[in-house]
Amino acid sequence: GSFNLMRLAAADMQALDALETAERGVIINTASIAAFDGQIGQAAYAASKGGVASMTLPAARELAKSGVRVLAIAPGIFGTPMLYGLPDDVQKALGDSVPFPSRLGDPNEYAKLAMHMIDNVMMNGEVVRLDGALRMAPQ
């Protein structure tokens, strides 16, 4: 999934003319805090998101010679259609579990981080947690 999409996108980006910065493109993958704090019952999910996180640096190093940057965002608990399908009290409890701000993340906050990553040419090979300092318990 993520690796093959990145591979195909990188091939297309490498064929582009470079910008003044010598850059040809930016790949931003989505990992998850589960890559770092997987819970009981999440082994497969944590492993898949851990794979996304762990391929970020070597992919960035490999694609650097072509002017393609690779980054990943590891979001915490965000307001998504899936979460909004949960009962209100569950949504509130999930939001309250975030140290600060104590609420669900807003997809616009994810988008703002992605835009910053695109604009900041020095960002490369990083996985950025976007989770309000949340660390998931094993449960």
Give names to the regions the model predicted.
Residues 64, 69, 123-126:
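Short, small/polar-rich loop/turn modules that mediate ligand/substrate recognition or access, typified
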Residues 89-109:
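Catalytic Tyr-x(3-8)-Lys segment
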